[in-house]
Amino acid sequence: MGSQEVLMDATKLASYSVILQILFRVLTFALNAFTLRYVSKEIIGIVNVRLTLFYTTVVFLAREAFRRACLSHSAQQSWRHTIHLTWLAVPLGICWSFILGWIWLQILEVPEPEAIPYYNIGVWAFGFSAVVELLAEPFWVLAQAHLFVKLKVVAESLAIIIRCSVTVILVLLCPQWGLLIFSLAQVLYTSALALCYIAYFARFLGSLEAEKKPFPLRRMREFLPRFSSSQAFLDWKQAWLAWSFFKQSFLKQILTEGERYVMTFLNVLSFGDQGVYDIVNNLGSLVARFIFLPIEESFYVFFAKVLERGKKVQSQRKEEISMASEVLESLLKLVTLIGLVIIAFGYAYSHLALDIYGGSMLSGGSGPVLLRCYCLYVLLLAINGVTECFTFASMGKEDVDRYNYVMLGLSLSFLCLSYYMTLWLGSVGFILANCFNMGLRITHSLLYIMRYYKGSPYQPLIGLLPSPVVVCVLAVSAAVTGYSEVALCCDKGWLLCLGHIVVGGLCLLVTLGAAVLSEKKLTHFIRSHLLSRHQRKEQ
């Protein structure tokens, strides 16, 4: 498959993933807004922070390293060895479920049974759901590697709809069940997800479509691990790469979910405050989840397939390295512009957004300040996602091992900084600590990219510099919307609040127009690779 075809499939995957993330977040926010009226914020804190952290930790530590190693491009790649490697995620997930389950029940603070019953059942249910999801890992890796873009969207959409439907029905009919509702919904979610992948490949293999595609498997039983006396069970080069990523996964998980670990292990916030923080945090991460994460996941596949891992620029094929440089520059430009727009408009609309979503419980106190700080974090999160996407896709094993030490230092500094800044500033301290560490991670990735392209004519990092016209328009928009908030929002009635929204909409249109007119190269990239598929369909 040529680099152009890989790029088209990767952009298609990103588009579908954005749709999936929008569906997921819209349903999640609607569900949170609904459940806030029927269950306590303490239960929301337990589910969204404590139990979800348990589940994501098990899943991440069990599969992340295998995913990165198995999706890396190699001319000698054997899919039999790859499948064997992905199956190791299941026993690893079982081990982590028992180890972390014991910690969650015996070491951490346990809520009072009278206030929040069924906590023990909730812990084991979320651990079981993680193992169920890992059963679909071989199918997920094959689907992702061969860019089955619609499968992921359909599977996760159905699973999300099932979870939300079960939660709403049980909250209405049996609100006294508390954590049992969310535990059952979580198990059904991962079960539906795994069954969708298995059912799809059961139908796909043996069909005419499978015969036409260069798919490496022909029967379902080939997904199962097989021992052979004439062939090694694993590709040890691939296994050692996975081991390097596995060591790194501990540190990356701490950096990704650091504030939740601090909340969970150090008890700096009550369960109720954790619930409020999580809701505000989710609202602040809307764009990150809608756009940035799908871009990172999809274009990691692109970079991993186009670039030879561990090789210098001079050793790469010219067409591939040129394409990778162009894509990296355009992605950096895109996410930087989106992040700057969020900063410019986020300050003036944070209070209104929280007031609409959760009322005075969220818009009062530190909620608006927290969301405004999160706008800066979103910009850093966007840039880091793209730079690390390229970095991890091009690093060799030795580079990954060296980066593990960097991650160790970042993890330790982040935990210490989060703890002390939270004691000093409350929940806002979490966001500021995240900003500091994200800045350090970006700096490391930028230095790596500069070394990677040193001695070549390519300069993809200029994508971090928006045009002066766009910067000026953003500054004016921030000033206008800031004045609009003071004059029209948020305690002056809904009619004036609507006027504040109209002012922001007009400023946003002007900003988008300035970006389209001044960022010609980015506009061409979006039209060529993100919109061309829809244009071909219309023709």
UniProtKB/Swiss-Prot annotation:
Main subcellular location of this protein, as a coarse class: endoplasmic reticulum
Compartment(s): Endoplasmic reticulum membrane
One BP annotation, GO: dolichol-linked oligosaccharide biosynthetic process
Disulfides per UniProt: none
InterPro entries: RFT1 (IPR007594)
Membrane topology designation: Multi-pass membrane protein
Keywords: Endoplasmic reticulum, Membrane, Sugar transport, Transmembrane, Transmembrane helix, Transport
Function comment: Intramembrane glycolipid transporter that operates in the biosynthetic pathway of dolichol-linked oligosaccharides, the glycan precursors employed in protein asparagine (N)-glycosylation. The sequential addition of sugars to dolichol pyrophosphate produces dolichol-linked oligosaccharides containing fourteen sugars, including two GlcNAcs, nine mannoses and three glucoses. Once assembled, the oligosaccharide is transferred from the lipid to nascent proteins by oligosaccharyltransferases.
The protein's name in its UniProt record: Man(5)GlcNAc(2)-PP-dolichol translocation protein RFT1
